[in-house]
Each structure stands twice: as C-alpha cells, then as structure tokens.
C-alpha cells in the first residue's frame, strides 16, 4: 500500500477570499475602517462568512478524489481576534463538510 502524501492547504488568500470580505465589512460598517485599517483581521466575525475563491472548492475536491493525498488545513489565528479560529472552523465545515474534521493545524507564521 502506497502512503499518501500530506498536503497542507492555507485558508486566507488561498481558499478564502478575505480581501473581498474586508472590503465588504468596511462598506457595511464604515465606522470600523479607521479603527481596523492596519489590522482588519481583528474584526470580530470577519472570518465566519467570506466567500471562497473561484475554483478553490473544486481544486480541493479533485485533490481529495485523487486518493493520493492526506489533506490538512494550515492557518493562523490573529491574537487580537480570539473568535477567528472558531469562525474558521465553522467556515471549513460549511464549505467542506467533514473533509477537514480534526485536520486543522494552527500556526502564527
């Protein structure tokens, strides 16, 4: 039996279109723009509902269906936004179901 290669997939900027979500937040909540202009990742709730990049879901599906890879998520969670990690976990479940269940690695680098 061939051992599957391990692949770590980043969330922000790879799967998750966080740039568009930040723009949407600042448009909907202009009072937040000045406070969070240098650290928008500290906005509570920012990581819960962003859209995935076009093609991201299909790319993960193809990797999974190939049977060649053990897929994991590698992401970071800003210290100034402790809810972000929970939001990211919910985001993964919403878009991928059980694909990344207990397969989320958090780092700050």
Predicted feature descriptions by range:
Residues 2-3, 66-67, 98:
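Glycine-rich phosphate-binding loop signature in dinucleotide/nucleotide-binding domains
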Residues 82-109:
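C-terminal cap/substrate-recognition subdomain and adjoining C-terminal extension
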Residues 1-6, 58-62:
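Short amphipathic alpha-helices and their capping/turn segments at secondary-structure boundaries
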Residues 5, 69-71, 102:
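Residue-level recognition of the N-termini of beta-strands and the immediately preceding loop/turn
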Residues 9, 50, 74-76, 107-108:
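Short His-Asn-centered micro-motif
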Residues 47-51, 97:
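Short, flexible loop segments at the rims of nucleotide/cofactor-binding pockets, characterized by
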Residues 2-47:
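Active-site neighborhood of HAD-like aspartate-dependent phosphohydrolases
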Residues 51, 56-88, 92:
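Substrate-recognition element of Asp-dependent hydrolases with the DxDx(T/V) motif
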